[in-house]
């Protein structure tokens, strides 16, 4: 059973298809941690060009999926309700496993530190029991621009 479904996720973050990379939130401990599921299917638009005959999810999109999961974690706090979380930095990103159609990505994000409207999270994208990607992300929370 999920904590948040896709429609609830879209109420929190501005991302939409084809750049929304999460299907559901499985676990959420506000201000502490989140676990999100992304089912990777052959229908993803990026597989048309990356790579024909050998589909591989681009590493930068795995990072984006982790950043979106981090956004949910951050924006579910009362302090940042109605705001937007922006990616400020990517540190020590490592890609350890190729992600392919049919894989289920489990995105694990843990709050490391937060000060004012900035903070750092530690992230892992898992396929089964193997880490596909690990990284630390820095975020900045700002007003939602309605322009």
Swiss-Prot record:
It comes from the Bacteria. The keyword Ribonucleoprotein does not apply. Keywords: Cytoplasm, Lipid A biosynthesis, Lipid biosynthesis, Lipid metabolism, Lyase. It is found in: Cytoplasm. GO terms for biological process: fatty acid biosynthetic process; lipid A biosynthetic process. One of its GO terms (molecular function) is (3R)-hydroxyacyl-[acyl-carrier-protein] dehydratase activity. The keyword Lipid biosynthesis applies. InterPro entries: FabA_FabZ, FabZ, HotDog_dom_sf. It is an enzyme of class 4 (lyase). It holds the Pfam family FabA. Signal peptide: none annotated. PANTHER family: 3-HYDROXYACYL-[ACYL-CARRIER-PROTEIN] DEHYDRATASE. Belongs to the thioester dehydratase family. FabZ subfamily. Involved in unsaturated fatty acids biosynthesis. Catalyzes the dehydration of short chain beta-hydroxyacyl-ACPs and long chain saturated and unsaturated beta-hydroxyacyl-ACPs. This is 3-hydroxyacyl-[acyl-carrier-protein] dehydratase FabZ. The gene is fabZ.
């Amino acid at each position: 059973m999920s904590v948040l479904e896709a429609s609830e996720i879209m109420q929190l973050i501005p991302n939409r298809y084809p750049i929304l990379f999460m299907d559901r939130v499985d676990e959420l401990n506000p201000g502490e941690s989140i676990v999100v599921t992304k089912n990777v299917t052959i229908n993803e638009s990026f597989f048309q060009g990356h790579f024909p005959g050998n589909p591989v999810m681009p590493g930068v999109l795995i990072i984006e999926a982790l950043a979106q999961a981090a956004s949910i974690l951050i924006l579910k706090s009362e302090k940042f309700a109605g705001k937007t979380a922006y990616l400020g930095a990517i540190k020590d990103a490592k890609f350890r496993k190729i992600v392919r159609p049919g894989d289920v990505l489990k995105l694990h994000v843990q709050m490391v530190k937060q000060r004012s409207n900035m903070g750092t999270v530690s992230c892992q994208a898992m396929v089964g029991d193997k880490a596909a990607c690990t990284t630390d992300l820095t975020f900045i929370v700002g007003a939602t621009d309605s322009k």
